[in-house]
């Protein structure tokens, strides 16, 4: 697939609650990364250096069953590092999952391999639970509905490069029909091992007043971010029954509703500041925006 896409988190329509408030600044972040503490090949400091050189403002290191050691180094780092961990295991019905817990404050004694117990503890402590690469893992929609995930990876760059299983838009639309507040994330899942050198392929842009742990996590929880492989939203604004956007140079802007509903604009000429406006249907339980630049 040659095009690069981005997806904006859904706007719940029947209750007239629009998700976005974009008066702050946009901050670039990557939420699924691994170091030598699990199955990655870079140290935490090396990983931070890589992502800071690419103008990332924050990252979440999500090693398998291992919280990053952030002791006292935060002030000297060129970007914000959020606590995170990747959990994996089987649930009570025998289904297998990978789940990111971003903003986790779990203590090491809880990492005893009990997947469901640790997942519930992370949820109770306020971690953002992200259903990781469901297509790659082979999860069904019903397996996602079964647990209290806050969102899922709609794009995982490592899975896409490895065997073409990185996209999970079918899972996302199914989850949105079940829960219109369900969030969509684009991630790298970077390891920096010779057979998996992939990175810089998927990230999120969070709109926040400042790049602090509290501000970033709060706005991720609210869904005040978009996921991207490159194209940019500059503004997202709402009228009484409409949404208008300004974007980077794109070829398509789409408003996507449930099942086969939706609207689109073909952006001929690829203006560097393209603008589009859509009427919103009150009959839709949710709508999401998508732009494409090639």
How would you describe each model-predicted region?
Residues 1-26, 179, 190-294:
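C-terminal functional module detector
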Residues 6-132, 136-148, 153-174, 178, ...:
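A metal-dependent hydrolase metal-coordination microenvironment
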